[in-house]
Amino acid sequence: MGYYTQYVFTIEEGPEEQYRSMTREIDGILSCDDLSLYESVYAKWYDYEEDMERLSRAYPEITVRVNGDGEDSDDLWQDFWHNGKRFSERVRFADYKDIKDKLN
C-alpha cells in the first residue's frame, strides 16, 4: 500500500555539482526524473531515512534540507542532512481542547 509524501529538496551549502549528483541518485531510487528536474517529488519513499543517511555520507561536503508534506494534514516536517547526520523538526498542531480557553 504505502503513503505519499511531497519531498522538497534545497541545498544549504556545498558544491552544486555534488547536490545534482545526489538528486540524480534519488531519481534512480524512486524510478523518476522529478527530483533532478524540479527539486521536488511526490512519492512513496519507504527507505527515506536509510537512503538519505547513506547519500549524505556519500556527499559529505553538502548540507541538504528536505521539507516533507504527507497525505495527512498534520504531517509536516523538515530534515537537515549532513555527512550521515540528521536534524529533524516536526510541526505539531494544537488540539481544540488545548486551546479552546484561549478563544474566549
Language model region names:
Residues 1-27:
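Short, extreme N-terminal segment that most often corresponds to the first beta-strand
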Residues 23-104:
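Charged interaction segments
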